[in-house]
């Protein structure tokens, strides 16, 4: 069974750095990459049709980000990732995905180059850090391409 590196992607630069790291790591270890994008539900909107339109717009934006990022890693690492788009709470989406896949070797998250590392990094390295069935790899968002290549 191939090792799968799970990357949670959003529109942040550090998420794209984490994706490039995971792609290079997977290519070097004959592994695979799962790209998980999460569409978060909007706060209550009085009209259901408006809420559905807002969520669909967010979904299309995230799918565009994923498509652009996937193009980068396909050309750089020569692998085709599995793309999963889920709706809901990001923490629950990550746990749900990992819970359905026995081949996830690591959760790969990008940390912001400065300030708060991001909500998923904070969650999965905080109070519940020991509850995942796989390690968490935190990739600094400030790494250069050369550093990514060396470390992967």
Report the location of each language-model feature.
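Glycine-rich, Arg-bearing micro-motifs that act as flexible, cationic patches
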Residues: 106-132, 143-149
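Active-site phosphate/pyrophosphate- and oxyanion-stabilizing loops and adjacent acidic/basic residues
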Residues: 23, 71, 96, 126
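Acidic, proline/glycine-rich short linear motifs
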Residues: 37-64, 146-152
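Structural beta-alpha unit
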Residues: 75-107, 150-152
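Short, well-ordered secondary-structure micro-motifs
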Residues: 18, 45-48, 95-96, 119-120, ...
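Small/aliphatic-rich secondary-structure junction motif
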Residues: 2-49, 131-134
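Short, solvent-exposed amphipathic alpha-helices that sit
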Residues: 21, 58-69, 93
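General small-molecule cofactor/ligand-binding pocket signal
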Residues: 34-36, 82-86, 137-139
